[in-house]
Design a protein with these regions (language model features):
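Extracellular glycan-interaction patches encoded by glycine-rich segments
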Residues: 185, 221, 227-250, 254, ...
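GGW-centered surface loops in extracellular recognition modules
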Residues: 2-106, 116, 122, 146, ...
Length: 278
């Protein structure tokens, strides 16, 4: 049991639902966007769509229980590489992140072996030309973004964008930091390994944002984040085909809200309990 009265099992939040019984993270917290390589919604049927290199055929990959269906993925990609064409949105808003250009699709299998971090499947962006994107969005502050990643490279941007008026994550030599409205905010997070990052923005005042790494707040430098809007999500680069990220990604979740402390802790613990990050 956790201190918040919940017990976590995969994407389930047990006893957290208003009517009692088992429910999923998305069912209880209603994010705007929810990409994850596990089942986090009771209505989700697929996590990713994969193209195999050998013949360019594609297949939707769903779940085995609440985990990614690794058997279906390895069977489909037996002896060849697999690339993600679609990261399905489990929020119910149908905001799937896609990449139609074969050479720009991030990898999920190498010669039939699933790419993984800490024993769980992970999507690999090569830092050269890979991306997954969703355009045509409408969003502004307040906002909460959560990402589970494992960085390899030391530069690049990913997150929510509208040209340079952005609120995104910026990779650095050590960890990552927030980049907003053309300015880099300090300080960096500390880890170059698998990490769960959360960025929350609230009102238009100084110190109106918070940044967390593996459940602990990183004290910011007091910058006022200012007004922002976004109209697209780009998971491994800027939407201008620049600033690519060499990293693994397992989850990206966004709320058009400033999630409460109670929700933040519950969501972080849910993700950590499945992926065993810290």
């Amino acid at each position: 049991m956790y201190g918040y009265g919940y017990r976590y099992n995969s994407g389930l939040v047990v006893g957290a639902g208003g009517g009692g019984g088992d429910s999923y993270l998305v069912d209880d917290y209603a994010p705007y966007i929810a990409y994850d390589l596990r089942k986090i919604s009771s209505t989700a049927t697929n996590s990713i769509r994969v193209r195999r290199l050998s013949d360019n055929n594609e297949l939707d990959i769903g779940f085995s229980g609440d985990a990614l269906d690794e058997s279906a993925l390895t069977t489909f990609c037996s002896g060849t590489d697999g690339f993600v064409t679609t990261f399905y949105d489990q929020s119910g808003n149908s905001l799937d992140a896609v990449m139609a250009t074969a050479s720009s699709q991030p990898r999920i299998c190498l010669n039939g072996v699933i790419d993984s971090v800490n024993g769980k499947p992970a999507i690999l962006g090569d830092g050269v030309n890979d991306s997954l994107r969703k355009t045509g969005l409408t969003g502004s502050r307040p906002n909460t973004q959560i990402v589970l990643y494992d960085k390899i490279g030391t530069s690049g941007y990913f997150g929510a964008f509208v040209f340079n008026n952005i609120t995104c994550f910026s990779l650095g030599a050590t960890g990552s930091r927030i980049y907003q409205n053309g300015a880099a905010f300090g300080p960096y997070s500390t880890l170059n390994t698998q990490a769960l990052l959360m960025f929350k923005s609230t009102e238009l005042t100084t110190s109106d944002w918070k940044f967390y790494e593996n459940g602990s707040e990183i004290t910011n430098s007091g910058e006022a984040i200012g007004t922002f809007t976004y109209n697209n999500i780009s998971l491994f680069d800027r939407p201008t085909n620049a600033s690519r990220c060499n990293m693994y990604m397992q989850s990206y979740i966004m709320f058009n809200s400033d999630e409460s402390t109670t929700n933040r802790l519950a969501i972080q613990d849910n993700i950590n309990a499945y992926y065993t990050i810290y």
